[in-house]
């Protein structure tokens, strides 16, 4: 490799160009700071500064005594949804039932065009959003919007984190969150979960290991369906109280449909925090809108970051969300939808139990999670041969493989539940 430069910026740019051109490849070790400084005739601090910039840009990664290596290029991970045209019965997509979603176009009110300089958050939506957030956010919170939960996670993390920063996440973890961490170059620290949410000792270990942020799901964890209990929330708060500098993100994506109570995990000592509530499951994934309640400094950084890009979330989307959230008819429809999702998941749980397959009853969300003691892929393939498409649990894993099946039950009928349960029993026995 031919690295040149007399300043930190010049050394950074020289290495950057070689990485982009392919002359330096992922995993390749960069020269030790001392050696490169001697070769270039410059101060070691200059080289160290250049390497630090490469790390922050996600181009290289400092690995302690091993030195600094060129980072692997991020690749797209598994995505929610399934490909159109598949002949398989879709129990893998993670989608809500389209029949449970309101017809937003019919709700849209006639509004005058919004122009530059219009307040970025519509006051009608703001009032309705505060009704959704006020009781669950710490006092003095600020309201912001994003283009869905994953966009909110990406934006809030970017307010306070740089590539290489450790972020504590549940294992297994929601696909959108995993992809966000990979794309931004954050280091995911796996935190084991159980039926009551993040395990306290596992979170403590991640924080002691240097986690700069914690991302967790209070209800309807995807893929397991777990919800944080009151007892667990209290224990998690006690741990987080000792780390006031750590950013806490709470992804309450299923809030409007959940049948589980919300138990707050953000302690009063936490300085940087955000509670995210997406409208995708309740009003439709294409709405691309999430409500964010957060501390004032995070809100200011979100606005600063939004301003030179999209500027604001479209007022057409805000109008649709406000019309739906303010409609008694839509509220009743969401109530029926939430009840329906519980009933459909219970149909499958009972059908599996009838076939001798015991599944945890305390779940929430659009899916049923079936833990396995082995790699799920042979079972996924066996079910595909019988006409079913499900998600193998390994795609949700953070470092340590998690074996299981995520089965989307949002549109499942009683007949299909019984057929699937029989086919699953046969596949397990094969």
Predicted regions and their residues:
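Walker B catalytic acidic pair
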Residues: 251-252
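Residue-level detector of anion-binding/catalytic polar loops
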Residues: 166, 187, 247, 358, ...
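Short, solvent-exposed loop/turn elements at beta->coil junctions and helix N-caps
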Residues: 278-279, 393-397
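Conserved core of the PLP fold type I
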Residues: 114-244, 256-274
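N-terminal basic, amphipathic alpha-helical segments
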Residues: 1-117, 121, 127, 307-314, ...
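PLP-dependent aminotransferase class I/II
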Residues: 274-352, 357-360
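Amphipathic, non-transmembrane alpha-helical secondary structure
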Residues: 12, 16, 154, 158, ...
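Short glycine-rich anion-binding loops that position phosphate/pyrophosphate groups of nucleotides
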Residues: 96, 219-221, 281, 412
